[in-house]
Amino acid sequence: MSVPSIPIVKQQFSPKFPRLPSSSLYPSSQSQNLNVPSGAFHPISIVHKEVCSSSCKRIWCSSSSSSTAEPKEGHEVRAQVTVRRKKLGVFVSGGGTNFRAIHEATKRGSLHGDVLVLVTNKSDCGGAEYARNNGIPVILYHISKDESNGSDLVDTLRKFEVDFILLAGYLNLYQWNDPSLQKIYIQHSSITSSSFWRQGIHGMKVHKAVIASGARFSGPTIHFVDEHYDTGRILAQRVVPVQANDTVEELAARVLKEEHQLYVEVVEALCEERVVWRQDGVPLIQSKENPNEFR
């Protein structure tokens, strides 16, 4: 979608945490107020691969893991700026299928980042099990009544030098008073009416509500997180038709399939610094192929 009439303000969406000495990169398992399973922290090999960043002046960019990637014939290369590989922290409360999709994308090289840590409030959930099986540190974290801003967790994430927090099926709300801690969140919703996901409806209940409402379309929505539930700026959506004879399970399966693909595409854009902001504060994703196109 071209947006020629509204000026685009290119902003770096890469908050940087204070760098710590390498000896303190991985936090101790005795962190205060953090129940970290023994042996959970294992060094993760970070493979630095060069890609060129997306900017309004750039014509070609490749996120390929190959260092010999070349621009397509007929494309002019005007600028190539190296973008470092991003460090990701993922939060889950359940099966973690979106987390798996993101991690698999990092392994196959289509996503210019690495999952360094998983945070969960349920130690036996599927997402935590997957993380442990893949050598990803797991932090079990429950916020206490006298510690409402999550400062312990913020400090731990800083030690991992996390660039982005990805909430993938994580339902707890923490009011972190830290503007440098950037978060995005995925939520099942009806794209024709945000009321389904702003009433605290989650999981299969949202698909049931969509069908009961008579809505003809549903789909996943990805938005930034603010201090309230489901009120952050929408970053991406995808349309999923609701069939006349859909069951809740059938609709949920189709939405989930699109959700996995959309979330990976959004994280790819974040890692390649292709998220830009209109002057009215609306976030857009810049096209890889044409920097003048946004969606």
From Swiss-Prot:
Species this chain originates from: Glycine max
Pathway annotation from the record: Purine metabolism; IMP biosynthesis via de novo pathway; N(2)-formyl-N(1)-(5-phospho-D-ribosyl)glycinamide from N(1)-(5-phospho-D-ribosyl)glycinamide (10-formyl THF route): step 1/1
Positions contributing to N(1)-(5-phospho-beta-D-ribosyl)glycinamide binding: 96-98, 259
PANTHER family for the chain: PHOSPHORIBOSYLGLYCINAMIDE FORMYLTRANSFERASE
Entry protein name: Phosphoribosylglycinamide formyltransferase, chloroplastic
EC annotation from Swiss-Prot or TrEMBL: 2.1.2.2
GO cellular component terms given for this protein: chloroplast; cytoplasm
Sites annotated Raises pKa of active site His: 230
Gene designation: PUR3
